Amino acid sequence: MKGCDVMPNWTHNKIICKKSIAEKLLTPVEDTYVLDFNKLIPMPNELDLTCGAIEDMSVACYYYSLDDNERKKVKDLLFNTKTDFYHNYWNKYSNDINRLLNGSLNINEISNNYDSSDDKMKEKYSSIYDLGKRYVDNIKDYGFPNWYDWRIENWGTKWNVDDEVSVIDIDKNNYEIRFDTAWSLPYGIMLKFSELCKDNEFHWEFQNEDFDGYHTLTKENGKIIDNVTGYDEEYTDDEIEI
């Protein structure tokens, strides 16, 4: 499983586009640029929550605090909301929920540990129950509990680019934009960006760190075409540099 804290392989991306189109993706900052995927597909602020153990435990605590009627509503929501790897969110959270229900986890100890921690989320969520409710509400409102799950589905990668971008002024009309993304081509971002371009304006190249060829994406009759060249299992690092 490719988790939120796992160090990824990188995908190297290069876009060549008109400067007027690049402005939809880039933000000038002093003498450089920031590339923010939120300009194309904004992530709701409520999803800016930690993923991992604190998520699982806080959802379990919130569920534990509810009466039987509310528990059923939450269980139905979690069970009917699909997610990769676990298939649905009930499968993801049910282990900790069951450990609370059978007494192998102590709810008061967990709550006190959260209260005495320096977790940054305490600034917004004063108790572990409030935090768990936020995760559940996010699933209800957005289909995902946290930034990681939402970005993987909507952007196609887990991290933003920000200032880790190179912008080359090719000529008076065009930029070359280079940046890396975690694990894969940011597929959702690529598709959204392609909507800004006419067929002859769209040009996106990418290479995966585990090298499966040089990919050049173009647009023909509104459809994205992936042209792959240079695939060779016996590659070296200098052969995969864009």
Write out the residue ranges for each language-model feature:
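Long, contiguous binding/interaction regions
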Residues: 3-242
